[in-house]
């Protein structure tokens, strides 16, 4: 799965981080259904914080019944966990990304980061696109 975008920014929802809140976080991703497949990248930025995935520990792809087409991919959801660095400190991440078609406004994101920083964000993309690929 590839893509990126920002969420949530215009709905009044906030993300929580290190005891504070703000509207919006951005992410870019290239993730495989098999954690051993390379490369796997996840970058998340919000406020003055930055998380970078170093190792994808687990990944599972599934189909929640909503069509990600085009193109057909056989799945539309990836969820998993990994380790990385947040603000140069060790951190862990769990995530779930769903491709619900074009242009991406129905795509959903859920990201939880702990360790070097904390972030909890979930919702529909407000800009960008998540794309499932074979």
Show the residue positions of the predicted features.
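Residue-level detector of buried hydrophobic side-chain packing
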Residues: 3, 78-82, 111-113
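Short polybasic amphipathic segments
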Residues: 36-44, 105-114
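A short, surface-exposed beta-strand/turn
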Residues: 91-110
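Boundary/junction segments of secreted and surface-exposed precursor proteins
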Residues: 1-18
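A short, sequence-level motif marking secondary-structure junctions
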Residues: 57-63, 97-102, 125-131
């Amino acid at each position: 799965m590839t893509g990126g975008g920002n969420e949530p920014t215009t709905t009044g929802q906030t993300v929580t981080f290190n005891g504070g809140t703000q509207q919006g976080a951005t992410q870019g991703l290239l993730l495989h259904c098999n954690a051993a497949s390379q490369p796997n990248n996840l970058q998340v930025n919000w406020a003055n914080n930055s998380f970078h995935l170093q190792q994808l520990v687990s990944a599972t792809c599934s189909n929640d019944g909503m069509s990600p087409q085009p193109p057909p991919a056989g799945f539309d959801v990836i969820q998993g966990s990994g380790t990385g660095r947040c603000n140069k400190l060790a951190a862990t991440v769990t995530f779930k990304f769903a491709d619900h078609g074009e242009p991406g406004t129905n795509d959903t994101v859920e990201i939880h980061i702990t360790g070097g920083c904390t972030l909890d964000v979930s919702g529909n993309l407000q800009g960008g696109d998540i794309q499932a690929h074979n």
